[in-house]
């Protein structure tokens, strides 16, 4: 095996001009509060066309079922959805008759809808590139978009911080009150180390 001395490693980062105009936020809650928090966010902000991403088809179906029981008009797309049902769902979503679509990354490939008001990462994606692709569903055709990430545990927060650093994005932590009011989360400075006196 031959080794070349002129080999170099190239790292490709997203270009600033490639980034759409999207305001990015996060909400932190307990894992058991994620569905209720997401539902309250959608209803309180008046989004008309929302795309929600889950990492697994099981969570995708479960979340859609929970939302339907809560009275939200939504459908889901994942690997177990038959083609006929998928086409029917997409026709409703594209026409604006379906306000909320819950999908996995794989099932959402090929979806091309320009006027998505909001993208919600119900699960923080496992790959940095998935985040970029997900939020790229909003903020199209020179429209301003909004992207939310729902944080349910520390690993999700750590992953979102990694994504923000990799993509050079600013993701503003927010607090959603029980009555649907949004405020910026106050980031507390870490406590100063205690000095030991001898």
Each predicted region: which residue ranges?
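Conserved helicase RecA-like core
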Residues: 1-187, 195-197
